[in-house]
Structure formats: C-alpha cells, structure tokens
Amino acid sequence: MKRKVKKMAAMATSIIMAIMIILHSIPVLAGRIIYDNETGTHGGYDYELWKDYGNTIMELNDGGTFSCQWSNIGNALFRKGRKFNSDKTYQELGDIVVEYGCDYNPNGNSYLCVYGWTRNPLVEYYIVESWGSWRPPGATPKGTITQWMAGTYEIYETTRVNQPSIDGTATFQQYWSVRTSKRTSGTISVTEHFKQWERMGMRMGKMYEVALTVEGYQSSGYANVYKNEIRIGANPTPAPSQSPIRRDAFSIIEAEEYNSTNSSTLQVIGTPNNGRGIGYIENGNTVTYSNIDFGSGATGFSATVATEVNTSIQIRSDSPTGTLLGTLYVSSTGSWNTYQTVSTNISKITGVHDIVLVFSGPVNVDNFIFSRSSPVPAPGDNTRDAYSIIQAEDYDSSYGPNLQIFSLPGGGSAIGYIENGYSTTYKNIDFGDGATSVTARVATQNATTIQVRLGSPSGTLLGTIYVGSTGSFDTYRDVSATISNTAGVKDIVLVFSGPVNVDWFVFSKSGT
C-alpha cells in the first residue's frame, strides 16, 4: 500500500511540474483589454475603439501596438495614433511617417490603413494598405502617385452627406490613397500623400489626428498590429530660398518661391495639376520676391488666383511701403480650388527691383507674370481694333484654373495650359462695318477647336477655328476660319475644346 501511495505521489508531482512548465510557456497578456466604445491614451499613443453595434475586443499593447477582433458588426474602427489640437497644418507639424507591421485576417469588408481627420476644411482621410473582400472606395480615381519603396496608390475623392464626423453629423469630403496591391507591413510617408492630394486640388485643413487603423464593415476578423511607430516633425517645411539670382519678370514666377514674408499664417499649398502655391493669407500680409529683372520696362501684371471672397493685391516696388505700381482686384472665383488668371495695368517699371505683394484679405496664389504691354484697355481708349493683332494674353477675363501666360522663346507672351471648357474674354473689339474671318497663331500636339462667340462663353457662335496638330506646343502656325459677319463694338469670347497654345489672333473683312 505504501509503495502505491508513493507512486501516486510521484505521479502527482510530475503532473504539477508539467503544468507549471506549460503555464510558464504561455505568454502573460500584459495589455489592457476593452470591449466597447472608448478613447484615451496608452503607451504614449492616443487610442480609440468605435462601433455602432456588434462584438469587439481591443487589446492595448506597448507603444502604438494593439490587437483586435470583431464579429456581427455594422461598422467598427480600432486605432492607435496621435491626436492634435486642430491648430496646425501638416506643414507646420513637419514630416509624418508611419512604420507598421500587422498580422491582418479579415473575413469580409475591412481596411488596414492610416486614418484621420482635419478641420477647416473638415476632411476624413484614408491611406489604405490592405483590404478584405472589397477594395475601397468604389469610385473613379483622380490620378496615381508612386512612392519609392512603397508602391503605387490610386487617389480618390468622395463626399459624405449628413454623416457622422468628429464634429457631429456633417457633410464633408473623404480623401483616399489606395494601394494597387496589398501589403501588411512597411513605411508610409503620410506627408507625401497630403502633398499629392493638395496638388490635385484636395485641400487639407488643420490636423486633428493620424492613426494606424483597422476598420471593419458588416464583417468579422482579427488583426495583430505588432509594429506601429509614428514619427512627427522630423523635417518641417523649409524656409523659402533667399537666392539673390535675378528672375525674369516676363517668365512665370511661382508664388511659393518668395524670399520673405511678414505672415505667421501663410503656407505653401498644393494646386491643381501637381502644382504649388501660397495660401492662408490674411489682411496686411506681405510677400517679397527679390531681384526681378524688368529690362526696358513692364506695364502689365497677371496672377493666377483662387478665392471665395472679393479681395485685392497691391504690387509695390522694393518694400511693403514702396512705390505703388498698381492694384489687382480679385473677385470670387467660386472656391479656393478654382483658379483664374486676373490682370491689371501697372506703372512702367524698368531695371532690377524687389517686388512686394501686399494683400488685403484671403486669397490663394499659384503664380504671376509681368508683361510689356498693358493687359487692360486704358480709360478713354477702351476699344481695340479688330483688324490689328490682339495678343492672346491681353484678355479681360478668363475661365480655367490652370490657364497660364508664358514667355515665348523669341520674345512676347502667349497663353497655354488650356483644357476643355476654358475660355478667355476680350472686351470692346471694334469691328467697324463688319468682319467675316478670323486668324489665330497657335501651337498644339493634338487636333482641337476654338469657338469664337459673342459676349459670353454661351453667346452667339460666330465661327469655329479647327486646329490640326502643329507637331508640338512650341511649333506655331496661323490658322483661319470664316465667321458670321460681325460689325460694331463687341465683346469676343474664345472657348476651347482642348489643349492649345495661342499667341495672338486678328479679324479680317474678307473670308478665308
């Protein structure tokens, strides 16, 4: 009996030791576990679990890492990142970089992404790295971007009407970068996505949040974010160049290439077609451009601008209180992303000078250029001879966010960067007793048309100039067309169906 008891005792001891070994091999869950909607800070990161309904579990681990599981949900988001006070733009924060790794196992509709919001404007944004059964957002892409070592993303913009937001129920824009192929680990330059969006006209506001996020929609799944490092402020936007190099007044000067400013709010922003400009301008702000070479003289000024309010820009020489050369009056263009070129006459200026733009209120500026001839007819001499060459850049108004005045190699200027639907208006053209044809000097790579209309872009159609390819945008040819007999003083509008550069045009009394 004693022998049997000893055997049982030895067996029990072995079992206990085995259990201890097994327990010792199981990792202890050190993270905090939450099940329902909650926000807070953990491990130096801001976190949030949000759902409308369903079963959710989120375990908060060291630093930015976490794991999550979901089922029977409507919509659920699990995220860890950094929140801000909506008082700085991404440029003011500096470079934002996310380095991540995730064991991602969705069953149905889900995203693995960098996610966040901005205010003013209110924007919800996604940089989607991987997804489940459906690739978001189900819209037509605006373009693509490629990041070195990160791959290619398609860009989308969608609108949410009366939907939940960080400011309650609201209507707001959603911006999307969606990879063309899935991945679950890597490094994301968030700032580069923001820059590319703005260059496509997708304006960012003041930063509220950036977070690595797992989102599920009417699905189930689990994910283990084993790496999530968010670095902010490594490389703020550099100050503009202080280069003393002379700049040609008659070539386009990019607004963001200024030498100094008195503004604490001004920022370099993105503009359509991958451009840049300046914005967040306030009354009294000044921007200085050094060493502008006017040669024998300039008497005109044009700027490509966007604004939702009427405002004005003074053009001064050498200092913010220097000689007032002229004032550019800017009417609302309809939105901060709708750019138009506006022109004004200035007092003749020669030689090399610093130019200071003095602002009376908010406006976005893409670029500006000076001209040797006055772009606006002088008071008391407000008609133009239809039978003398009319420079294309001497328009009174234009429609088209990307239209630009540029210098020609042999001297003079022209208009270009024209797209379908753009138009330019030339006021007070004196046709006398009647013109029946028009000739334009143009350059284009592809066949296109220019409609000649009376009064407005939808006014009476006088005729259409059919333009064949000239071989390149630098090869100019004269092209003519017959128009309906036009007499007296009229406003003429050129309406474009596609890309073309226009140097000048002129009317004649006989058909061509």
Swiss-Prot record:
Binding site for Ca(2+) 1: E254, E256, R276, D366
Region (2 X 61 AA approximate repeats): 279-477
Binding residues for D-xylobiose: Y280, N337, N364
SMART domains registered for this protein in UniProt: CBD_IV
Record: residues binding D-xylotriose 2: Y417, D474, N501
EC number(s) recorded for this UniProt protein: 3.2.1.8
InterPro entries: CBM6, Cellulose-bd_IV, ConA-like_dom_sf, Galactose-bd-like_sf, GH11/12, GH11_AS_1, GH11_AS_2, GH11_dom
Cross-referenced Pfam families: CBM_6, Glyco_hydro_11
Residues of the CBM6 domain: 251-371, 388-508
Record keyword Metal-binding present: yes
Protein origin, superkingdom: Bacteria
An individual GO BP term: xylan catabolic process
Positions that bind D-xylotriose 1: T271, Y280, N337, N364
Record pathway: Glycan degradation; xylan degradation
Keyword Ribonucleoprotein carried by entry: no
Domain-related comment: XynA is a modular enzyme. The number of CBM6 (carbohydrate binding type-6) domains varies between strains. The polymeric substrate can interact with several of these CBM6 domains.
Protein family: Belongs to the glycosyl hydrolase 11 (cellulase G) family.
Protein's name in the database: Endo-1,4-beta-xylanase A
Gene that this sequence comes from: xynA
